[in-house]
Design a protein with these regions (language model features):
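All-beta strand scaffolds that present successive hydrophobic residues in beta-strands
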Residues: 1, 27-32, 55-61, 91-98, ...
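Short glycine/acidic-rich loop motifs that flank beta-strands on beta-rich extracellular proteins
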Residues: 9-16, 37-48, 68-81, 89, ...
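Extracellular beta-strand-rich solenoid/capping regions of secreted or surface-exposed proteins
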Residues: 18-25, 50-52, 85-88, 112, ...
Length: 235
């Protein structure tokens, strides 16, 4: 509680990992409260996942997460693919609430994959503004979500809700991909594509500029307030 974590090596790997090395016992009741996390370099800032076993009842509450890339990291192209992992392999049960996230150079803020994953992001303030100097993305070479990639399940296991989200990226970027649910959020966006392959999209306010479809291959799209202009981003 109240700790500050700085990983400023600008290296190719390393971060804070909450995981279990064995399936013989479970790890439970892990809390980070009112902490600050700073990261320069590749790999995640924070990763929570069961790995060889299970981690349950993990809570991140009132914390702040900052991507603070040094010039050394940028010159070496040491930027994270995933900024925060909330589930990957093994069994994961994690909740992130009342947190602040600020990112720039990472490919995707949240990785929330795995059939045995339950991850909820609730009431958070999330901002990612891709710098003009960052290499442009090609939708033919990947989904390129800025906010999150989920586990493609319709059981409510990977959810982002009740949050304030600001995203700015190039014409090959989309908001999110394969979440169980995106609901009750306010999104201010400027990017190429919207929400894709998400099982429930409800009660969101979506404002800004999107070049292509706002919703693509989504089910359960209802009660959203969409105020979006279509445009073409240079580059």
């Amino acid at each position: 509680e109240g700790c500050v974590f700085r990983q400023m090596t600008s290296g190719a790997s390393g971060g804070i990992w909450v995981r279990n090395w064995t399936d013989r016992v479970e790890s439970r009741n892990i809390r980070f409260q009112n902490c600050e996390f700073y990261k320069s370099g590749a790999d995640e800032l924070l990763a929570v996942w069961g790995w060889s076993g299970a981690v349950r009842d993990v809570v991140l509450s009132g914390c702040s997460f900052y991507e603070t890339q040094t010039q050394e990291a940028l010159d070496a192209d040491h930027c994270p693919v995933w900024f925060i992992t909330l589930g990957q392999s093994g069994t994961t049960d994690v909740r992130m609430e009342d947190c602040t996230v600020r990112a720039e150079y990472c490919e995707t803020i949240f990785r929330m994959v795995g059939d045995k994953n339950r991850a909820v992001v609730d009431n958070c303030d999330i901002t990612m503004k891709q710098p003009d100097s960052m290499a442009k993305h090609d939708m033919k070479k990947g989904a390129n979500p800025m906010l999150a990639r989920g586990n493609d399940r319709a059981d409510g296991s990977t959810v982002i809700q009740n949050s304030r989200i600001t995203l700015s990226g190039d014409n090959g970027r989309r908001i999110c991909y394969q979440l169980s649910a995106l609901k009750g959020n306010t999104l201010d966006v400027s990017l190429g594509y919207g929400i894709a392959s998400t099982k429930e999209v409800s009660g969101n306010t979506i404002r800004g500029r999107i070049r292509h479809k706002v919703f693509q291959d989504c089910s359960g799209v209802e009660n959203n307030n969409v105020e979006v202009r279509r445009f073409s981003i240079l580059g």
